[in-house]
Amino acid sequence: MSGAQPSQGQPSESANSEFVFRRDYRAPRALVLSAWTDPEQLAEWWGPHGFTNRVCELDPRSGGRLRIEMHGPDGTVYPVVGVYEAVESDRVVFTCLPLDEQGAPLFEIESAVTFAERASGGTTQTVRTRVRRVSPGAAIHLVGMEAGWSQSLERLENHLAQRGHVRPAASVRA
């Protein structure tokens, strides 16, 4: 049900880690896209189970910035800043930098999210996330990334369902 393709081994400070997630939704492409580009909607589902987003600032256009502060169940704040590389009707590409307690980047995450209309109706969403430029000692922060993305996309499923859209047609491994 996670919709995830397992990564190749444990992340390391010199290795690139890539994760691919694919989900099919019985919702129009424009509605799935808006869940990624509207700050109010993104704040409702972004992050693992139990996380909230008290700050969610998005400027979804090429060169636009994003800033999110995820709050974990234990109260820990996980700030993320980034830049949109492309925002189109069928894809969103952005780079995120999770920050440490001093505001220094831990690593860089490049994500490409594509939205394809299905002939039978609905939308296939594919998320490709690649980790790059891991700071010395920051690899430990990557351990739960695949599970975190899976949980975040489960929250997106629930978000779309709460907005009156039927649950995804399928969650499959890419």
Regions found by a protein language model. Name each.
Residues 13-15, 60, 74-78, 103-107, ...:
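A generic structural micro-feature
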Residues 1-52:
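Hydrophobic ligand-binding cavity/cleft-lining segments
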Residues 29-30, 60-61, 85-91, 114-124:
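A short, structured loop/turn motif at beta-sheet edges
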Residues 1-13, 158-174:
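Basic/polar N-terminal segments that are highly enriched at the extreme N-terminus
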Residues 23, 55-58, 80-86, 108-117:
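Hydrophobic/aromatic beta-strand elements that line small-molecule binding cavities or substrate pockets
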Residues 21, 66-68, 91-96, 125-127:
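Short hydrophobic/aromatic-rich beta-strand segments that constitute the beta-sheet cores
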Residues 20-21, 40-77, 168-174:
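Short beta-edge strand/loop motif at the mouth of beta-sheet-based domains
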Residues 99-150:
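Beta-strand/loop substructures that line and gate deep hydrophobic ligand-binding cavities in soluble
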